[in-house]
């Protein structure tokens, strides 16, 4: 299966009631884009560095916030070294780190944070099981 198929079929999928993430991507730890939805924001190198720093040192992004394509998200409870969650108004983002990649989902209402977490973390867990 291509990386784009993972994004299209497993991240940008209907989670019920017609809700889908607003955008999603799978990127390498170096920030290289493996696959993304059409409207996923272009990440800046310093944003990827901040994300990786937070995965390596929990709480790194808390003082400054999580930035994705220049949009700031308030960092909320995640899982140290594995999951970063951000909130912005009625939307937010979930990031799951695997051995080689970062799975990212960005959502807006009516999708709930829990629905986005489920979609992103389920794919991330699968990739981890596959050694990716």
From Swiss-Prot:
GO CC, one annotated term: cell cortex
Origin: domain of life: Eukaryota
Location of the protein in the cell: Cytoplasm, Cytoskeleton
Classification via SMART domains: PROF (SM00392)
InterPro entries the UniProt entry points to: PFN, PFN_euk, PFN_sf, Profilin_CS
Keywords (A to Z) from UniProt: Actin-binding, Allergen, Cytoplasm, Cytoskeleton
GO molecular function: actin monomer binding
Record keyword Cytoplasm present: yes
Pfam family, one: Profilin
PANTHER family associated with the record: PROFILIN, PROFILIN-3
Record text on subunit structure and interactions: Occurs in many kinds of cells as a complex with monomeric actin in a 1:1 ratio.
Family note: Belongs to the profilin family.
Name of the protein: Profilin-1
Recorded name of the encoding gene: PRO1
